[in-house]
Amino acid sequence: MIRPILLHPDPRLKKLCDPVAQATEDLVKLARDMLDTMYDAPGIGLAAPQVGINKRLIVMDCHKAPTPARPLILFNPEVVWHSSEHSTYEEGCLSIPDHYADVERPEAVTVRWRDETWAKQEETFTGLWATCVQHEIDHLNGKLFIDYLGLMKRQMITRKMEKAKREIARGGR
């Protein structure tokens, strides 16, 4: 099921998310809905707060054709190591459509999480995968990619998003 994605500014996007105690049937269904929503958008990552759920859950799939899809469901993800080398990617966000900016992050990160069967997982991500997982974990901590930008750029994007939300509310766009 495709779920509506919250748009910035929305106070729910700025909250610290609660840990998941167990991968219940409802939460696994939520994760699968999030994957459907992410692919439909289209995007490469989505965090539970972006669909209005204050839980530490993200989904992602950064594959590029012709490699096969690799959907990941991560409950309670945490970065346990990051490289000292950094890289810069132009990031966007499904909650801030049509806005992009360069963000510098560690080039590689090791992340621990529980999967949908509640098995412990750990993997080192590099490149776009590393950027994506860090971006999505930021959502769980109430942080958006625009929070890495200067105040003026962040305010400009926020004003544009407020205007876009008003237009959507009036039935436009």
How would you describe each model-predicted region?
Residues 1-173:
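Positively charged
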